Amino acid sequence: MEIGIWGMGRMGFNMARRLVDKGDHRVIAGNRSSGKVDEAVKNGAEGSYSVEEFVEKQASPRVLWSMLPAGDVTDKMIDRFVELGDEGDIVIDGANSYFRDSIRRAEKVRNAGLRWLDAGVSGGVWGYEVGYCTMIGGD
């Protein structure tokens, strides 16, 4: 499976690493700072250094997974996914967002013809070893 994860903080980085190491998935890793992307590439992911490249590197229908903190930064990233994505792409919010924010984002994504998953992630940085718990809702 091909999965794009944007946000190579502690959670996003280790999730990408686990998907490559233990799941044999093609992972496209994106982050605003290139050092984090370079580190993900060393661990087997494919790097993307801009949101445009992140979207372009994936075949449609894409999995556009945001692993950014809840709040404004997540809103801005989802706006970019909607702007650059194609009908049928799947947008995933991995932040543990306030439910009303998730409802608002879901409506925006669906209105653009994309699919939505709210997938708050738990498991901390040790999730690489033992796996992650995701609380998923959406399309």
Regions found by a protein language model. Give the residues of each.
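NAD(P)+-binding Rossmann beta1-loop-alpha1 motif at the extreme N-terminus of oxidoreductases
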Residues: M1-R62, G85-G88, V125-Y128
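Rossmann-fold dinucleotide-binding core
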Residues: I3, T74-M77, Y98-D139
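Short amphipathic alpha-helical segments
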Residues: A16-R18, V41-K42, K76-D79, I103-A106
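Active-site-adjacent beta-strand anchor residues
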Residues: G30, M67, A95, G137
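General beta-strand structural signal in soluble alpha/beta enzymes
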Residues: S48-Y49, I92-D93, R115-A119
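Beta-loop-alpha module in the N-terminal Rossmann-like domain of NAD(P)-dependent dehydrogenases
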Residues: E52, L64-R80, Y98-D101
